[in-house]
Amino acid sequence: MALAGPLKVCIVGSGNWGSAVAKIIGHNVKNMKKFASTVNMWVFEENINGRKLTEIINTEHENVKYLPGHKLPENVVALPNLTDAVRDADLLIFVIPHQFIHKVCQEISGKVHKNALGITLIKGIDEGPEGLRLISDIIREKMNIDVSVLMGANIANEVAAEKFCETTIGSKNKNHGLLFKELLQTPNFRITVVEDADTVELCGALKNIVAVAAGFCDGLSCGDNTKAAVIRLGLMEMIAFANVFCKDSVSIATFLESCGVADLITTCYGGRNRKVAEAFVKTGKSIEELEKEMLNGQKLQGPQTSAEVYRILQQKNMVNNFPLFTAVFQICYEGKPVEDVISCLQSHPEHM
């Protein structure tokens, strides 16, 4: 790796999580000679009460739409043009909804220098003709750069409020993982680096499906014992899925990192997927309607990931091996009754 400092950082995305990460990076780079002191952040331009969102961020230093109430450091510069934002960047932090990754990579392919490094904070997967494709694989293929991943029990508003949490960086090149740890770690944002990157990334995507099931249980007022069963059986399906679909060997220890069981717990109790799934049961409205009503422009990942997982499992004739993942998809998209989530627990293969 021939990166010469100070390294220029660009954050590709500026939603709730992207803005929280921008706050960390903006503060950290001020005190480190290794990194350039200005941080570019690509912002999908929106109009907020007659003003451009980039203008608000650059003058008031707050993302009033996606992270209100938290000041961003003044060295974080919002740019509406993606190509301008990534120009000359050495380190790219990808933090956008997973459904936009193809479009973003196509736009900046060939515009980033060959020694640049990426890290994806995107929780989701893609499916192609060969089945599973990880978001990091898409970035790697389209951008021709090395990509690490960061996943963990990180509810963005709590991270922005500097409440203590942990996270996991997965990097097949340990030195690249350690470089991103240096950029991102703070006393209240503690990072472990592991080499089992594909498992780290899969955990971040699959836990959102389990959180939807947890939200269904909350909507049905099932109680904490049932939710604990959803979390445990969901974790078992996550492990089984990783064992089938990961190209490299899977370490069970990775599921004990923040990206695994910790992220699963926090998402099943505090995340947006759980919240919307509970409302789905109580209101009878569609997932799409609730996303528009409840999330202030943010995207829901769990239902869409369940659909992608379902199609991947169909290709392998393995739908019946993953009853919880399947039930979430069928309830969200095929009109199956929400109570099916309970019957899938009752007859789960783990009990047979």
From Swiss-Prot:
It comes from the Eukaryota. It is found in: Cytoplasm. SUPFAM superfamilies: 6-phosphogluconate dehydrogenase C-terminal domain-like, NAD(P)-binding Rossmann-fold domains. The keyword DNA damage does not apply. Keywords: Cytoplasm, NAD, Oxidoreductase. Pfam families: NAD_Gly3P_dh_C (PF07479), NAD_Gly3P_dh_N (PF01210). It is an enzyme of class 1 (oxidoreductase). Substrate binds at residues 123, 272-273. Its EC number is 1.1.1.8. NAD(+) binds at residues 13-18, 156, 272, 299, 301. The active site is at residue 207. It catalyses: sn-glycerol 3-phosphate + NAD(+) = dihydroxyacetone phosphate + NADH + H(+). Gene3D superfamilies: N-(1-d-carboxylethyl)-l-norvaline Dehydrogenase, domain 2, NAD(P)-binding Rossmann-like Domain. GO terms for biological process: carbohydrate metabolic process; glycerol-3-phosphate catabolic process. GO terms for molecular function: glycerol-3-phosphate dehydrogenase (NAD+) activity; NAD binding; protein homodimerization activity. PANTHER family: GLYCEROL-3-PHOSPHATE DEHYDROGENASE (PTHR11728), GLYCEROL-3-PHOSPHATE DEHYDROGENASE 1-LIKE PROTEIN (PTHR11728:SF7). Belongs to the NAD-dependent glycerol-3-phosphate dehydrogenase family. Plays a role in regulating cardiac sodium current. This is Glycerol-3-phosphate dehydrogenase 1-like protein. It comes from Xenopus laevis (African clawed frog).
